[in-house]
Amino acid sequence: MEEISLANLDTNKLEAIAQEIYVDLIEDSCLGFCFEVHRAVKCGYFYLEFADTGSVKDFGIQPVEDKGACRLPLCSLPGDPGDGPQTELQRSPPEFQ
């Protein structure tokens, strides 16, 4: 690219140069994204998940279903009244010992 002194250019020329740089950056970004998606599809690690739009609430956040609290063998979940640490461990079935 040729060297241009920016002090001698009027605003129209500066805007034209800025627009050209802007368009080049956008085109390079879009082309790079297209190549990344193409490679992901060809290599098999591009997966799309389609969600039913009826279950999407405000701001596109999926509703969370309460499946109950899980219990860990050596501790209790915070907020469970009266449950202290459980010291007994489960033994494996006899065929695995």
UniProtKB/Swiss-Prot annotation:
Q: Where in the cell is it found?
A: Cytoplasm
Q: Name one GO cellular component term.
A: cytoplasm
Query: What other comment is given for this protein?
Result: Encoded by an expressed retrotransposed copy of the Atxn7l3 locus that emerged prior to the speciation event separating primates and rodents.
Q: Which organism is it from?
A: Mus musculus
Keyword Lyase in annotation = no
Gene (name only): Atxn7l3b
Region: Disordered; residue ranges are 76-97
What is this protein's name? Answer: Ataxin-7-like protein 3B
The UniProt subunit note reads as follows: Interacts strongly with ENY2. Interacts weakly with USP22.
Q: Which GO terms describe its biological process?
A: regulation of gene expression
Report if keyword Hydrolase is assigned.
no
Q: Which UniProt keywords apply?
A: Cytoplasm, Phosphoprotein
Q: Which family does it belong to?
A: Belongs to the SGF11 family.
Q: What is its main location?
A: cytoplasm
Q: What does this protein do?
A: By binding to ENY2, interferes with the nuclear functions of the deubiquitinase (DUB) module of the SAGA complex which consists of ENY2, ATXN7, ATXN7L3 and the histone deubiquitinating component USP22. Affects USP22 DUB activity toward histones indirectly by changing the subcellular distribution of ENY2 and altering ENY2 availability for ATXN7L3 interaction. Regulates H2B monoubiquitination (H2Bub1) levels through cytoplasmic sequestration of ENY2 resulting in loss of nuclear ENY2-ATXN7L3 association which destabilizes ATXN7L3. Affects protein expression levels of ENY2 and ATXN7L3.
Write down which residues bear the modification named Phosphoserine: 92
